[in-house]
Amino acid sequence: REVKGDVRIHGVCRIECKTTKHKSFSVTLDMIRKIEEAAISGGEMPAIVVEFNNGAGKKVAEVAIIPTYALDQLCTR
């Protein structure tokens, strides 16, 4: 069975990590559905983390994409 997600903290979260040297990165509905399906089946919070680098591997910025229900949980703590 294929396990989706590059990083998994059992029972907490499942993270799909992406890296690009470009100034933009497209997140597709398919990407969201795959990580969300895998995370929810394990009772975990899904996330996609995108790292932007300078082309030589040096990190310039990093952002996490999470569902709005997860953001709501974080904001109401």
Question: Where are the predicted features?
Answer:
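Catalytic phosphate/metal-binding cores of nucleic-acid and nucleotide-processing enzymes, i.e., regions
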Residues: R1-R77
